[in-house]
A protein has these predicted regions:
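Non-catalytic signal-transmission and effector/linker regions of two-component phosphorelay proteins
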Residues: 1-5
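Short amphipathic alpha-helix used as the core "switch/output" element in two-component signaling
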Residues: 41, 63-74
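Receiver (REC) domain active-site loop signature in two-component systems and cognate sites
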Residues: 57
Length: 96
């Protein structure tokens, strides 16, 4: 039995493998994608309990992806992951 369905969008997914394995061991089903377009496509196909979203990806940025995901699934919680400390990025993400 699954504890929940997670979507993780990050262009450096290979670096996150240990975290994904940890979540899977804890009973979560984790769908991984490497860009915003694929994340949006997955949100059209499935209902996720939580989305982990990198801010800096090729193609659509994390913020652009977040806006489209919130249009499709406004109640789904999204955690933005970024190395940036720029306040405007945080403000934009919170405002979405």
């Amino acid at each position: 039995m699954s504890n929940g369905l997670l979507l993780w969008a990050d262009d450096e997914m290979e670096l996150l493998r240990a975290h994904i394995l940890f979540l899977e061991k804890k009973g979560y089903d984790v769908v991984t994608v490497t860009n915003g377009t694929d994340a949006i496509d997955q949100c059209r196909q499935k209902t996720f309990d939580l989305i982990l979203l990198d801010e800096m990806m090729p193609g659509l940025s994390g913020l652009e992806t977040l806006q489209q995901i919130k249009e499709l699934s406004p109640a789904t919680p999204v955690v933005m992951v970024t190395k940036s400390e720029e306040e405007n990025i945080m403000d934009q993400a919170i405002g979405s």
